[in-house]
C-alpha cells in the first residue's frame, strides 16, 4: 500500500474520533487523547498569542468556556488531506462580559505528526 494512503487513512481515523468526541461535548478528552505534548495552537493574528503545550491549551479552553455562553454549536467534518484535517464550527454564542450575542463561523486546521495533533490553526469570522 502507498505510504500516502496509510497516512491519509491514519489521519482519517484520528480525525473522525476527534470530531466524534467534540460532538459529544468531550473536547477536553479529545485534546488529551490527540494533542501532542508540545502542541501549538494559533488563533488569527492579534486575537490572542499562540499557546503551546497541553496545559496551555486546556487553560485556553477553560478561558473560552468561561467567557462565552454557547447557545448552539454545529460541527462539520472532518475533511482530510494527507496528515491534515479541517473541522468547521458554527457557533451561536453570547460574550458574557458584554452580553453581545453573535454567530461565529470558525474553521480549525489540524496537522498531525507521529499520530498526534502537533498544530491547530484557527480561521474565523463573526457577526
Task: Give a label for each model feature.
Residues 8-9, 16, 28-82:
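A solvent-exposed, acidic/Ser-Thr-rich amphipathic alpha-helical stretch
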Residues 82-91:
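A short hydrophobic beta-strand element
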Residues 66, 93-103:
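Short, cysteine-centered beta-strand-loop-beta hairpins and adjacent loop/turn segments enriched
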Residues 71-73, 88, 102-108:
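Short, surface-exposed coil-to-beta transition loops
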Residues 35, 91-93, 108, 123-124:
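Short beta-strand segments enriched in hydrophobic/aromatic residues
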Residues 105-127:
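Short beta-strand edge/turn micro-motifs at domain boundaries
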Residues 40, 100, 116-118:
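Residue-level signal for well-ordered, solvent-exposed loop/turn and beta-edge residues enriched
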Residues 1-24, 33, 55, 116-118, ...:
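Terminal "cap-and-tail" regions of soluble proteins that handle hydrophobic small molecules
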Amino acid at each position: 500500500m502507498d505510504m500516502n494512503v496509510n497516512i491519509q487513512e491514519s489521519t482519517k481515523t484520528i480525525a473522525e474520533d476527534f470530531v466524534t468526541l467534540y460532538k459529544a461535548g468531550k473536547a477536553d478528552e479529545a485534546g488529551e487523547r490527540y494533542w501532542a505534548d508540545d502542541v501549538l495552537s494559533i488563533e488569527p493574528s492579534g486575537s490572542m498569542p499562540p499557546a503551546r503545550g497541553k496545559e496551555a491549551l486546556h487553560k485556553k479552553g477553560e478561558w473560552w468556556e468561561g467567557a462565552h455562553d454557547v447557545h448552539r454549536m454545529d460541527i462539520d467534518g472532518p475533511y482530510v488531506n494527507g496528515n491534515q484535517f479541517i473541522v468547521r464550527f458554527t457557533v451561536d454564542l453570547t460574550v458574557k462580559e458584554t452580553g453581545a450575542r453573535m454567530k461565529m463561523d470558525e474553521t480549525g486546521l489540524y496537522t498531525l505528526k507521529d499520530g498526534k495533533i502537533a498544530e491547530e490553526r484557527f480561521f474565523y469570522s463573526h457577526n
